[in-house]
């Protein structure tokens, strides 16, 4: 995957101490080169970290560690991760060349899929519809069609999860003579909490109210 650095002046240095926790997908409502020029124009007062074009190219306009101006206006949001502060500080913005009523091209989709995978791995972003969202979830009034009805959400999540599963290696963990099922992902070994605790003679209880696992002797 080739990412071309094309700097935009429209950004804020740093992220106000916030951690990147989500990806926000956008549609440009315009074609190249106009959309790229606009995102790099100081008069626009707008930008994104990345732009994915219809021919499959990826441009990076703002460094990940800095704040791009892509989703700062909040209007009737329905997004669980919104914490009352500017979403730009804790999100990565990806623009897609095109219009809300047009499908992404296959080259564009594959490039966007690869970029999502890279960011998910880099920032440990969960693959779900709260951590990967459309702009409309943050501004449901002004940006109701961003990225629009043609954006391939189902396909994107299916492909991302498929790739996530392919990175998992199933293993057996031998614990004091007992064989436990586990798996390796990203160089780390995991085992089911309940099975491990039971092997240790501990009791496991799921507290649904607090949404936490409780372990006792």
Specify the residue positions occupied by each region the protein language model found:
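Acidic glycine-/aspartate-rich tracts in secreted/extracellular proteins
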Residues: 29-32, 56, 99-100, 137-143, ...
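Primary recognition of N-terminal secretory signal peptides and signal-anchoring hydrophobic helices
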Residues: 162-217
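N-terminal catalytic cores of peptidoglycan-degrading enzymes
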Residues: 1-87
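Basic/polar, cationic surfaces and motifs that engage anionic cell-wall
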Residues: 2-6, 13-17, 89, 97-167
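Sec/Tat-exported extracytoplasmic proteins
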Residues: 27-29, 62, 119-124, 160, ...
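A mature extracytoplasmic/lumenal domain signature
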Residues: 27-29, 63-65, 98, 136, ...
């Amino acid at each position: 995957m080739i990412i071309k650095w094309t700097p935009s002046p429209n950004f804020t240095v740093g992220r106000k101490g916030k951690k990147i926790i989500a990806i926000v997908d956008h549609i440009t409502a315009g074609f190249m080169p106009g959309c790229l020029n606009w995102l790099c124009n100081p008069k626009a007062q707008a930008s994104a970290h990345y732009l994915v074009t219809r021919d499959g190219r990826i441009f990076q306009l703002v460094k990940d560690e800095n704040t791009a101006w892509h989703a700062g206006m909040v209007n009737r949001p329905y997004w669980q991760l919104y914490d009352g502060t500017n979403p730009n500080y804790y999100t990565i913005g990806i623009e897609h060349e095109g219009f809300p009523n047009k499908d992404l091209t296959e080259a564009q989709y594959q490039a966007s899929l690869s970029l999502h995978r890279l960011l998910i791995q880099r920032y440990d972003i969960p693959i779900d519809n709260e951590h990967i969202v459309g702009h409309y979830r943050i501004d449901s009034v002004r940006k109701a069609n961003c990225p629009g009805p043609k954006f391939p959400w189902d396909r994107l999540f299916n492909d991302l999860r498929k790739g996530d599963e392919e990175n998992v290696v199933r293993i057996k963990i031998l614990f004091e003579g007992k064989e436990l099922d586990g798996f390796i992902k990203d160089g780390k070994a995991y085992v089911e909490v309940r099975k491990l605790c039971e092997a240790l003679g501990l009791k496991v209880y799921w507290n649904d109210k607090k949404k936490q696992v409780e372990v006792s002797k």
